[in-house]
UniProtKB/Swiss-Prot annotation:
Complex formation: Homotetramer. Forms an RuvA(8)-RuvB(12)-Holliday junction (HJ) complex. HJ DNA is sandwiched between 2 RuvA tetramers; dsDNA enters through RuvA and exits via RuvB. An RuvB hexamer assembles on each DNA strand where it exits the tetramer. Each RuvB hexamer is contacted by two RuvA subunits (via domain III) on 2 adjacent RuvB subunits; this complex drives branch migration. In the full resolvosome a probable DNA-RuvA(4)-RuvB(12)-RuvC(2) complex forms which resolves the HJ.
Keyword DNA repair tagged: yes
Purpose of the protein: The RuvA-RuvB-RuvC complex processes Holliday junction (HJ) DNA during genetic recombination and DNA repair, while the RuvA-RuvB complex plays an important role in the rescue of blocked DNA replication forks via replication fork reversal (RFR). RuvA specifically binds to HJ cruciform DNA, conferring on it an open structure. The RuvB hexamer acts as an ATP-dependent pump, pulling dsDNA into and through the RuvAB complex. HJ branch migration allows RuvC to scan DNA until it finds its consensus sequence, where it cleaves and resolves the cruciform DNA.
CC terms in the record's Gene Ontology section: cytoplasm; Holliday junction helicase complex; Holliday junction resolvase complex
Gene3D superfamilies registered for this protein in UniProt: 5' to 3' exonuclease, C-terminal subdomain, DNA helicase RuvA subunit, C-terminal domain, Nucleic acid-binding proteins
Protein name, per record: Holliday junction branch migration complex subunit RuvA
UniProt-annotated stretches for the region Flexible linker: 144-153
Residue numbers spanned by region Domain I: 1-64
């Protein structure tokens, strides 16, 4: 089982990278985000590896962080999500953005990934909503947001507020954190317009 590879980039393809490790070229399939962050041919690179062994093939998937690899594994625990769809989701959303989308029940953001229709997006949100908080690191903001949401807070106004703040130029994590703070500071039960105002107030501090 291969867990990690450190070597020199030989070539970067549309959906994979060939990593030269002591003269052996390993083909690792990666998300578009990972490929975009890799250096050029001839430069050093380190990839966390997920190894798939089938009767007729051995396939490697490469990630820049262990967290991204864990998300790849977790996504495939959802019915109807295979390696191709999991990589498509990770090509569209960072681990932090994906965690926020699940916490916010934001199916629209997840369905932006190629090959992810509304039904699959619903399953991802539904099946992972209780598993996602087990992760740490980049996902910490979304965990806090999920705790602020609780069971009695309507998801739609929260999702709309985060989307609006994102459209104003803030990153998704900034927007999610601002809305979480707004909920904590008296915004529970507020409509999207009020959450946007409170969120902007938090961002201006």
């Amino acid at each position: 089982m291969i867990g990690k590879l450190k070597g020199t980039i030989d070539e970067i393809g549309e959906d994979h990278v060939v990593l030269d490790v002591h003269g052996v070229g390993y083909v690792a399939h990666c998300s578009a985000r990972t490929l975009a962050k890799l250096g050029r041919a001839g430069e050093a690179a380190v990839l966390f590896i997920e190894t798939y062994v089938r009767e007729d093939q051995l396939k490697l998937f490469g990630f820049l962080s262990a967290l991204e690899r864990e998300w790849f594994r977790l996504l495939q625990s959802v019915q109807g999500v295979g390696s191709k769809v999991a990589l498509a989701v990770l090509s569209t959303l960072t681990p932090g953005e994906l965690a926020n989308a699940i916490a916010l029940q934001d199916k629209t953001s997840i369905s932006r990934a190629p090959g992810v229709g509304p039904k699959v997006a619903v399953r991802i949100v539904t099946e992972l909503k209780n598993k996602a908080p087990a992760f740490v690191g980049e996902m910490a903001p979304s965990i806090g947001l999920k705790q602020e949401l609780g069971e009695g807070v309507a998801a739609a106004p929260v999702s709309d507020a985060v989307s609006a703040l994102t459209n104003l130029g803030y990153s998704r994590d900034q927007a999610a954190n601002a809305v979480a703070a707004a909920l904590k500071n008296g915004g529970e039960g507020a409509d999207s317009a009020r959450l946007i105002r409170l969120g902007l107030k938090e961002l201006s501090r």
